[in-house]
Regions:
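FAD-binding beta-loop-beta segment adjacent to the flavin cofactor pocket
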Residues: 49-58, 149-150, 297-299, 354-381, ...
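Glycine-/small-residue-rich beta->alpha transition segments that form the dinucleotide
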Residues: 113, 130-132, 136-143, 181, ...
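C-terminal catalytic lobe of FAD-dependent flavoproteins
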Residues: 248-256, 260-320, 325-351, 434-498
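Rossmann-like dinucleotide-binding core of oxidoreductases
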Residues: 3-8, 12-13, 18, 22-29, ...
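Glycine/threonine-rich phosphate-binding loop and adjacent beta-strand/alpha-helix elements that clamp
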Residues: 334, 338-415
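Core beta-strand elements of the Rossmann-like FAD/NAD(P) dinucleotide-binding domain
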Residues: 9, 123-132, 325-334
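Feature captures the FAD/FMN-dependent oxidoreductase FAD-binding
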Residues: 77-141
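Beta1-alpha1 glycine-rich phosphate/pyrophosphate-binding loop at the start
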Residues: 3-13, 18-102, 202-203, 270-276
Length: 498
């Protein structure tokens, strides 16, 4: 088709985190310049902007937690700290000149599809009309607060880890932390080294694998800077190890699961000396059923004299502290909630309405599902990045976003050339895709009896049950038959006379 016939779309990107930055860069490389990025906060960064708790770091090796086109030889640690990751995304955004296209401190409040376009209203009451909307709002960005009676009655300082209060000095304080997931383990490992008195309230023990957090010297950084091939090799090695150990261990490969299970159990047995404490820290579910924690510091932290593990269930929160079901009040000055996020909210509470005014809540009333994690029937030209059943878990989310971004660009190209009048997966394609996902879940570790944020309200894992290689392969070429080929009528069709 001649270039004169290629349509040039307007695109709105919601969020200037890792995926939003990536999408803007890729769109411009594809010759699409009419791009608006709406960011609710004052700067880019997403997860790494919002999570500033002590000890925050990525549990994926830093040299593979970068864009494929922008390596970073300057990481200080194998597991990069949050401030360095935030700095990396800010630097990439500057280098790419994205600041002029990002509208900071402006959230998207309404997103309605009508007359073949998306009509947007922002928190500043600005109006936009665009062809495509890309929701790059991320997965874990709506803090989940525990449903514990009396939570609001606590008389001391209290906050969620994603809303860390840096004005409060924990030194000399009686601190309680609810939760033992990945974030909690990082916080506990860090603040246990202060002179606070720390009580950890554990509902569920976690499996932990120890991987040393290597520090890179300036000489090593210089060598990596001068030799891009060495840097690329390091990235490939980390990716190979993760794909063939952790990723395969949770999706049904027997030998990788045996290896990872042995590593986790050996770590606990070797590094927790007290048999009573070790018993409390021993999970009652298979390794990998919940997100595996990567930490070389957690068990050491839990054995410090100023750290106390409380496994008795919480009854309520009082003004003085946490009251357990045995009637004991654990008096506290500070209460920290490491209780995770709401993983199924995605772009909500945005007022998102597709064709015929159908809301996203109505579309997802029975089940939060999408076609290939990205396309929602009834919401034409709308892409949900890192949606349900993306392969989230002990692998680089950046790699996932790059695969999805390339796939979205191929779909937009089909629209530009006129092969697809709109980009909208059919309901049948969505149902078949999710049946395919469900068929693969039986061999995964996520269905083996534990409760985790991976599971939806029906207890089904919102994960990818097959290999990483298979996921990449299935996003290489869009299946045209899975998409609507005739634009649905925007008005009620004429009916024959009686």
């Amino acid at each position: 088709m001649a270039n004169a016939q290629i349509r040039s779309p307007s695109v709105a990107i919601i969020g200037a985190g890792m995926t939003g930055i990536l999408m803007a860069i890729r769109l411009r490389e594809a010759g699409i310049s009419d791009i608006t990025i709406l960011e609710k906060a004052e700067k880019v960064g997403g997860t790494w902007r919002e999570n500033t708790y002590p000890g925050v770091a990525c549990d994926v090796p830093a040299h593979m937690y970068t864009y494929s086109f922008r390596a970073n030889p300057q990481w200080s640690n194998r597991f990069a700290h949050g401030d360095e990751i935030q700095g990396y995304f800010e630097q990439v955004a500057r280098e790419q000149g994205l600041s002029e296209q990002i509208r900071f401190n402006e959230a998207l409040e309404q997103c309605h599809y009508r007359d073949g376009k998306w009509h947007l209203t922002t928190s500043k009451d600005a109006q936009l009309v665009v062809d495509f909307v890309v929701s790059a709002t991320g997965i874990l960005h709506h803090p989940a607060y525990p449903d514990i009676p009396g939570l609001e009655s606590f008389g001391g300082d209290s906050w969620h880890t994603a809303r860390w209060n840096h004005d409060v000095d924990l030194s000399g304080k009686r601190v309680g932390i609810i939760g033992t997931g990945s974030t909690a383990c990082q916080v506990i490992s860090e603040i246990s080294e202060t002179d606070c008195d720390l009580t950890v309230f554990q509902r569920t023990a976690q499996w932990v694998v120890s991987v040393p957090d290597k520090e890179y010297s300036e000489a090593e950084k210089t060598r990596l800077s001068r030799d891009p091939s060495r840097l690329a090799l390091l990235r490939r090695r980390y990716a190979f190890v993760l794909r063939n150990t952790f990723s395969k261990a949770v999706t049904g490969s027997k030998l990788p699961h045996l290896l990872v299970s042995w590593l986790a159990k050996r770590n606990l047995r070797k590094n927790v000396r007290d048999p009573e404490l070790r018993a409390k820290l021993t999970p009652d579910y298979p390794v990998g059923c919940k997100r595996l924690i990567i930490s070389s510091r957690f068990y050491e932290a839990m054995q410090r004299d100023n750290v106390h593990l409380e496994t008795t269930a919480i009854n309520n929160i009082s003004e003085q502290g946490v009251v357990t079901v045995d009637g004991i009040t654990h008096e506290l000055d500070v209460l920290i909630l490491a209780t995770g996020f709401k993983p199924f909210d995605f772009m909500r509470p945005m007022d998102l309405r597709g064709r015929d005014g159908v809301t996203i809540d109505e579309a997802w009333e029975k089940k939060v599902q999408a076609y290939r994690s990205i396309c929602i029937p009834g919401f034409p030209n709308f892409f949900l990045m890192l949606g349900p059943n993306s392969p989230i878990g002990n692998y680089s989310v950046i790699a996932m976003s790059e695969v999805q971004t390339d796939y979205v660009l191929k779909l937009i190209d089909l629209w530009r050339s006129g092969e697809l009048p709109t980009v909208e997966a059919t309901e049948d394609a969505k149902q078949r895709y999710n049946a395919y996902l469900k068929a693969g879940m039986g061999k995964t570790v996520w269905v083996r009896g534990c409760q985790s944020w991976y599971l939806d309200a029906d207890g089904d894992p919102a994960m990818w049950p097959y290999s990483w290689e298979q996921w990449v392969h299935e996003h290489e070429v869009p299946v045209l038959d899975d998409f609507v080929h005739q634009p649905p009528a925007e008005v009620e069709p004429l009916r024959p006379a009686a």
